[in-house]
């Protein structure tokens, strides 16, 4: 990415009176008048698109060349040019991928082109909408990055829309998967690049690191080249700068993933660390809860008691001198105990080919590029008995909040933005604009049911699956972790029911499992992998039976993620239904509610007014969790701002 991007440094988040005025500006950006104006433009674009239906290919290409020239001269063009361009892309979409944008898709593309976050309900065709907006940006001749929630969606969307981009004279590439530096450099030369936020930010940090390291050598080499003594220096940057970014599933990227900064790191060998980690694992095995230490599962804190301190002191002679201090000993043992009490295989990580691979809680996917810091990753490896890796040393870091505010043009779309409207405007200056649905939604939402124990809940889920399965309708059950998906599958087998399981263990079968999930009588259990971007098509027989039935069997820390799962049914006006079946042993309830409050909840009946109270407790716990996550995101951004202010000095 070129040094030009460095000129656009993000301004601080408005505070005080400036913050109040900024908030009023955000309300103005989201007012209904803007929606009405964009809907009028979308109606005009739809009519103009239909007028191109019988236009010969030669005339269509002439119009394409003329429109491209106009956009290259001025991206934020007048309404006439914009409507002509959008209508042309719509007709080319029909000829290239047999999809003609609906009016609401035109509206979404226009909203993104004008810098809004278009909130489009799940199933409304965001993939095509994003592509229309990306073509307009690509015509400008400046770099456009389309951010997807994961590598699967990156590859899928780029592949599906490639014929449209080619028809519009725009080059496209996908930055997902494992690419060599040369392949990645070539990828970033395309007009439109589909890539995940983590990959793009990591490449940006690598560019900055390479620039700093090579500054002196570059000056010397450039001088030699000018005098004919050396070849022209090769481009170090992976891209053409930070100009336009379009974020699909924007709340996942800007909210869920922004809790921690992205750290570019490299393994660093620390003498004696592996031995110290194994020593701590042995000490932890000898300790007894309540006698030697306490483990608070609500706050996830370990407190070492006198018995633990005595055992550590007695065994300290086996440590290298640098690890013998009381502070270091206690940190090592706390990590070892945390692994045993708070970090669970199948929920937080998997063991694959003798390696610990972390799982993303929001997406349910494996993240082999990630590792835990401060020796915690090595503590997990010691507990699982796999070879210990070296800890990573930070080479550079940046928050997503800081990174995305460096783009000149910033827009996106998602189906679940309303809960985060204020934060999206306050941090990113990104106003949310709701887009109406193409057809009225027919989803039936049943009341939430909350059970006392996990076993009671699994039995209720099995009974619900059996009842709906008997009618011939397909069922999708959403859970949070790999272990929960496998546990529920075993319960269904005991009831004589079989189910396809989609989780991080069998991610390679994702496309095949999703393709069958809408078939009559099919039962699918899925982690959050199926929560975003998953289009479950229905057979005609399935529609006549009532469509897909979604069971939310575990609540997430944010209600937005639950709504994403619910959105797998009732897409494009299809019939469907949703029910939420939970228990008082959900992680978010245990972390956010006091033991006394949970005790009172267990004494309540499961019907009538009490059922509403229990459902209200779930929403209360989720709101508390979301508030904590916002505090973390704010702290991350403040840390970035402090670094930006301190490092120049």
Swiss-Prot record:
Its main location: membrane. Signal peptide: none annotated. Its EC number is 7.4.2.8. It is a peripheral membrane protein. It is found in: Cell inner membrane; Cytoplasm. One of its GO terms (biological process) is protein transport by the Sec complex. Pfam families: P-loop_SecA, SecA_DEAD, SecA_PP_bind. GO terms for cellular component: cell envelope Sec protein transport complex; cytosol; plasma membrane. Keywords: ATP-binding, Cell inner membrane, Cell membrane, Cytoplasm, Membrane, Nucleotide-binding, Protein transport, Translocase, Translocation, Transport. ATP binds at residues 105, 123-127, 535. It catalyses: ATP + H2O + cellular proteinSide 1 = ADP + phosphate + cellular proteinSide 2. It comes from the Bacteria. GO terms for molecular function: ATP binding; protein-exporting ATPase activity. Monomer and homodimer. Part of the essential Sec protein translocation apparatus which comprises SecA, SecYEG and auxiliary proteins SecDF-YajC and YidC. Belongs to the SecA family. Part of the Sec protein translocase complex. Interacts with the SecYEG preprotein conducting channel. Has a central role in coupling the hydrolysis of ATP to the transfer of proteins into and across the cell membrane, serving both as a receptor for the preprotein-SecB complex and as an ATP-driven molecular motor driving the stepwise translocation of polypeptide chains across the membrane. HAMAP family: SecA. This is Protein translocase subunit SecA 2. It comes from Magnetococcus marinus (strain ATCC BAA-1437 / JCM 17883 / MC-1).
